[in-house]
Design a protein with these regions (language model features):
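Conserved ATP-binding loop and adjacent catalytic segment of the adenylate-forming AMP-binding
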Residues: 1-23, 36-41, 50-52, 62, ...
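Short acidic amphipathic segments
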Residues: 114-120
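Conserved C-terminal "lid"/linker of ANL adenylate-forming enzymes
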Residues: 95, 121-128, 132-139, 148-200
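Conserved ATP-binding/catalytic segment of the ANL
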Residues: 33-38, 42-105, 110-113, 129-130
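Residue-level signal for well-ordered, solvent-exposed loop/turn and beta-edge residues enriched
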Residues: 25, 32-33, 84, 181
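A structural signal for short hydrophobic beta-strand segments in well-ordered beta-sheet cores
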Residues: 24-26, 75-79, 122
Length: 200
């Protein structure tokens, strides 16, 4: 939660810190170990406000709440030294390329900063060698055209090579949920079915 005394920056960029009598931790999704401050991992919570389980759904409950009562939210987050949390994306959206975890939100925020980009979805696509590789589905900003090489060079100024998208696609419209969120799994499935042509 945030407080009236929190700075504007904290209110705008974090979700605050834990409420009284609630525990939170950030864990490595693969090992379950708590990660150091400012490291991205899965956001878990435990306390009086955590549900006891899904009604008549024991398997779903077991997947979400562990034996120690920790609710595994499926959110990727980081927590600073003060205990303030920042949401970094969804665990299901995380891309694992050759054993390296890549967080789409990081790439998407960088690409949003480019003047030719109106909207973007970064997705992991299956790859025989690496397991997954990074792909960017880009909708140009109004009146703009996007250039693959320009966007690639722009990202390389900020990112390690393995995080830079291998595949680039230009999008007119995204598949959306009823609430307007991009359905990344649909983009992935469409690519597998051969429905996308790469940007030149």
């Amino acid at each position: 939660m945030t407080h009236t005394t929190d700075t504007i920056e904290d209110k705008a960029s974090t979700i605050g810190n834990a409420m009284p009598h609630v525990e939170v931790k950030i864990i490595d999704p693969e090992t379950g170990e708590t990660v150091p401050p400012d490291t991205v991992g899965e956001y878990c919570a435990r306390g009086y406000l955590v549900m006891h389980g899904y009604y008549e759904m024991p398997d779903a409950t077991a997947e979400t709440i562990d034996a120690d009562g920790w609710l595994h939210t499926g959110d990727l987050a980081s927590m600073d030294q003060r205990g303030y949390l920042t949401i970094e994306g969804r665990l299901k959206d995380m891309i694992i390329r050759g054993g390296e975890n890549i967080y789409p939100k990081e790439l998407e925020e960088l690409l949003f900063g480019h003047p030719t980009v109106g909207e973007v979805a970064v997705v992991g696509l299956p790859d025989d060698k690496w397991g997954e590789v990074v792909a960017a589905f880009v909708r140009p900003a109004a009146g703009q055209s996007v250039d693959r090489d320009e966007l690639f060079s722009y990202l390389r100024e900020h990112l390690a090579p393995h995080k830079t998208p291998r595949h680039w696609f230009e999008v007119d419209e995204y598949p959306l949920t009823g609430s307007g969120k991009i359905q990344k799994f649909v983009l992935r499935d469409q690519w597998v079915d051969g429905q996308w042509t790469e940007m030149a």
